[in-house]
Amino acid sequence: MRTFRLSSTQMKQRIGSRFAKTVLVALLTLPASGFAKDDALSRDDALWLERVTYGLDTATVQRFRELGRRRFLDEQLAGRNDRLPEAIQSQIDALDIQRTPVAQLVVDEVAEQKRIKDLDNPEMKKDARKTRNELGNKFAYQATRRELLRAIYSPDQLKEQMVWFWLNHFNVFAQKGYVKFLAGDYVDRAIRPYALGNFRDLVLATLKHPAMLQYLDNAQNATNKINENYARELMELHTLGVDAGYSQKDVQELAHILTGVGIDTKHEPPRLAPRRQDLLLREGLFEFNPNRHDFSDHVLLGQTIRGGGFAEVEHAVDVLVKQPQCARFIAQKLATYFVADEPPPSLVDAMARTFQRSDGDIAAVLRTMFESREFEASLGKKYKDPMHYVVSAVRLAYDGKPIANVHPVVNWLNGQGEPLFGHLTPDGYAMTESAWASSGQMSRRFEIARAIGNGNAGLFNNEDGGPNPPITGFPRLSTRLYFEGVEPYLSKATLAALTQAASPQEWNAFLLASPEFSYR
């Protein structure tokens, strides 16, 4: 972990304080009423919770105390407690994305784009495209809003981290085609149900989702017009990794196997020869169209896959996920996300063995990681990406109080270069410190810390037009939660700097801008 490099004066300058230098030790550093220092979590337990969750709040600490580390981990790996506070669930339930059939959205979008293309008037065409784009952006924003509310408030904190991890791993870009209309459905149908489940099921769910098929062009992949984009990324980014021993010929063979895997935006079924009618598959917008499929036999990674319809695709996925390279690739990526930018090879090896032994049981692989000596030794040393930083700051500052406006959170993520559904290329966002620890990034974190610490971020300005919740002023971070779960892992330099804060608001900003708070 980095040492604290800023003096208290420098911190005050960076955060823009105009207060005189006043030490508020009695107000800011004495334990909250009824709290004894002996009740604090150990440093290791506090940091362990910071890693397993998106950051501490009182409910999380209380649940940890009730269960202990082992049973708390069991509960998190099960991922069955996703009940949200009523005020948060009400916000989500009111979103159009919750009640608008996604298939109809896409069918309407395809029809509208065709109508717009046929317009003769350039101004009418421009206005019509703007209207459609605004509608799509509304649905993409609602998908983002829903995911952020879940990340901040769900008791299933590990599951929420894994939803973000897999959403980044199986990245789609909302601004391509009509993906913006599909982003929320992609999370809820292809990612969330399998986030702690079986990796093969997860791969197949993303493979069959129209967001992925639109984003990586497999909807255009047909026997007479091969498109290799998705086949290449399925091997390189989703299952095997780079330099995993496959060849361009393997990519080509997989592309042929994936022909006919596409999207159905028409009501009428394709005309099929009688012998192939039973091979047509339609599930929502997903379609396997035998007329567009290459039924030849193919050889993938040395294994022959006989022509036979969508069963070929399932066979190909089985071949990919059972490769030792796949086990190691996924283990390496999980360990990079949770443990270290360069995770210990011994840990990656152990996780890969669990992956193979369990046939890709994600929860089992995570358990191997969380219960390892290497994981314990890494606590407090993994740099937070913007998503982790922002969500953990809101969780600590407001401690379960329902926010009413997610726009500031979205803006903070955008400003740090990590918007949800916003990564153009399929490789997803980087998970290493060097990607997020530049001087510009640090300045943005200071601004976020100040906005949250001062209470003027606008998080309680109801974005749906209703009355604002009865929350005024700035958050009080020097609470029992701070003394119980945060103070144990702060350095002496940070604790000394906090005593130099000239106001409670500045104290908040100092804490959220401290080096320790940027690590987990």
Per-region residue spans from a language model:
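Bacterial N-terminal signal peptides that target proteins for export
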Residues: F4-V23
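Bacterial N-terminal signal peptides
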Residues: K21-P31
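Flexible, low-complexity segments enriched for small/polar residues
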Residues: K37-T60, A94-D96, Q323, A327-S358, ...
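Short alpha-helix boundary/capping elements
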Residues: T53-D57, N81, F170, A174, ...
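N-terminal accessory alpha/beta regions
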Residues: T58-H169, F173-G184, A190
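A general structural motif at alpha-helix termini
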Residues: R65-G68, L77, T206, M369-R373, ...
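Active-site substrate-binding loop specific to GH73 endo-beta-N-acetylglucosaminidase modules
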Residues: E123-K126, A143-T144, V179-G400, N405-V409
